[in-house]
């Protein structure tokens, strides 16, 4: 019975200890790394937007031909 209670309290203790150790190891990116990540994310957003816009431009005339302009 005591082993079950110890195990029950040991799991959150280990979780807290591992979590706090992980947070201590994490470091903020420097300015150069932050700018490179931001550029990559912005490029991805722009490319995905352009792809969606091009697909929409192609889809509208095809839809009008197939549906008959309804």
Curated annotation (Swiss-Prot):
**Chief localisation class:** endoplasmic reticulum
| Extracellular membrane side | 63-70
Query: Membrane spanning segments where?
Result: 34-62
Molecular function terms in GO for this entry?
protein transmembrane transporter activity
List the GO cellular component terms: endoplasmic reticulum; Sec61 translocon complex; Ssh1 translocon complex
Q: Which residues lie on this side of the membrane: Cytoplasmic?
A: 1-33
- Leader sequence segment: none
* GO BP: any one term: post-translational protein targeting to membrane, translocation
Listed Pfam families: SecE (PF00584)
Q: Where in the cell is it found?
A: Endoplasmic reticulum membrane
Q: What does this protein do?
A: Necessary for protein translocation in the endoplasmic reticulum.
Q: Which NCBIfam families match?
A: secE_euk_arch
What protein family is recorded?
Answer: Belongs to the SecE/SEC61-gamma family.
Spell out the HAMAP family in the cross-references.
SecE (MF_00422)
Quaternary state and interactors: Heterotrimeric complex composed of SEC61-alpha, SEC61-beta and SEC61-gamma.
Q: Which PANTHER family match?
A: SEC61 GAMMA SUBUNIT (PTHR12309)
Protein name per the record: Probable protein transport protein Sec61 subunit gamma
| Source organism of the structure | Schizosaccharomyces pombe (strain 972 / ATCC 24843)
Which gene carries the instructions for this protein?
sss1
């Amino acid at each position: 019975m005591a082993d079950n209670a110890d195990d029950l309290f040991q799991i959150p203790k280990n979780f807290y200890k591992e979590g706090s150790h992980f947070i201590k190891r994490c470091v903020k990116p420097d300015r150069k790394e932050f700018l490179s990540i931001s550029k990559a994310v912005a490029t991805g957003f722009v490319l995905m937007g352009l792809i969606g816009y091009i697909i929409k431009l192609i889809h509208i005339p095809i839809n009008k031909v197939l549906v008959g302009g309804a």
